[in-house]
Amino acid sequence: MLFRSARARKQVGPDGMVMFDAHCALPPPFLIQLAGAIQAYDVTYIEEPAVPGNIEVFKRIKQHVKIPLAVGEQARTIWDIIPYLQERIAEFVQIDLAHTGGISQMLKMATLGEVHQAALAPHSVTSDLGMSANLQVSASVPLFLIQEYYPSITPKDLIRKSWDVDKDGYASLPTTPGLGCEINEARLEEISRTPSKPEWPTRGRLKDGSISDY
């Protein structure tokens, strides 16, 4: 992880942002030790430092880690993030629109973050349709930092979108009615009739056979 952090900093230069995703996978003592080691690479935040639910574990991590913490990827409602904001644990909220109650719930959670000076940095591993909704929310939130984006996992020719992401990572906003996407219903019907193996990110297993949610 030290090597990857150093390489990431070198690739993006002094003005780029480097984030570290702990993916709830590290015991607190290891995370605390690692955070101290990668701090030299000016890490913007540590994402998912622990499994959500035990606020005392997050308090312990926050007490020892100087890098800002980002939480909220697995949050479903405002009640899931309130404790982390009230206890001043989270500097960033990573709400995932696909996990919450849609645009309305995400806006409420982003507003709560703003009240506590926690910037929005949405988590998003989704289709073009989901990304369109994310962009609509992100564009309307004053305290917005960055939008996670992966090249589309949407089946080819299924969705025509009215936005794009350029080579520098900047996204244009949807320009057509609604979410800014048009669904090819004939293609959707075709796909629904064709059995297929689930692709990333729903594989569920790593190369060594171990189980993973990614």
Stretches found by the model and what they are:
Residues 3-65:
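Metal-dependent enolase-superfamily TIM-barrel catalytic cores that perform enediolate-based chemistry
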Residues 36, 42, 51-178, 182:
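Shared catalytic-loop signature of beta/alpha-barrel
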Residues 159-214:
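C-terminal extensions of enzymes
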